[in-house]
Amino acid sequence: MTFRLIAENRKARFNYEIIEKIEAGIVLQGTEVKSIRAGKMTLADSYAVVNREELYWLNGQIAHYEHGNIHNHEPFRSRKLLLRHKEISRLIGLVKEKGLSIIPLRAYWKGSKVKLELGIAKGKKLYDKRATTKERDWQREKQRILKTNH
């Protein structure tokens, strides 16, 4: 089975501490699939919520299909995510008890299906973000020093 990356939420790893990852399918309309094939999907600032024992992806953008007609889809509509009932029940427990968030990390093709990799995440504090930036800068500096010495 081949995996082809469609979009990635790069800010998610900076703003959140990812505790666990889950793969979910998405219910899409025809023009949405065509727009995704054209690379017009954005995961930034989107999240997933549980509503009546179902999981929905909110605030994710799939741009209008250029060659669509009057029946083109809404770019920011809520989209149902497909998971097993047992997984959804576990997510409900994690979100309610521990105050965690469900955020999309990546979107990719798995065969002919579009999948979302969801992260169960805890928001980072400002000092955690600073520490992450400091560590990343140190790693870059270390690599630069090692490169110049060889």
UniProtKB/Swiss-Prot annotation:
PROSITE patterns: SSRP. Keywords: Cytoplasm, RNA-binding. Required for rescue of stalled ribosomes mediated by trans-translation. Binds to transfer-messenger RNA (tmRNA), required for stable association of tmRNA with ribosomes. tmRNA and SmpB together mimic tRNA shape, replacing the anticodon stem-loop with SmpB. tmRNA is encoded by the ssrA gene; the 2 termini fold to resemble tRNA(Ala) and it encodes a 'tag peptide', a short internal open reading frame. During trans-translation Ala-aminoacylated tmRNA acts like a tRNA, entering the A-site of stalled ribosomes, displacing the stalled mRNA. GO terms for cellular component: cytosol. GO terms for molecular function: RNA binding. One of its GO terms (biological process) is trans-translation. This is SsrA-binding protein. It comes from Magnetococcus marinus (strain ATCC BAA-1437 / JCM 17883 / MC-1). Belongs to the SmpB family. It is found in: Cytoplasm. It comes from the Bacteria. InterPro entries: SmpB (IPR023620), SsrA-bd_prot (IPR000037), SsrA-bd_prot_CS (IPR020081). The keyword Acyltransferase does not apply. CDD domains: SmpB.
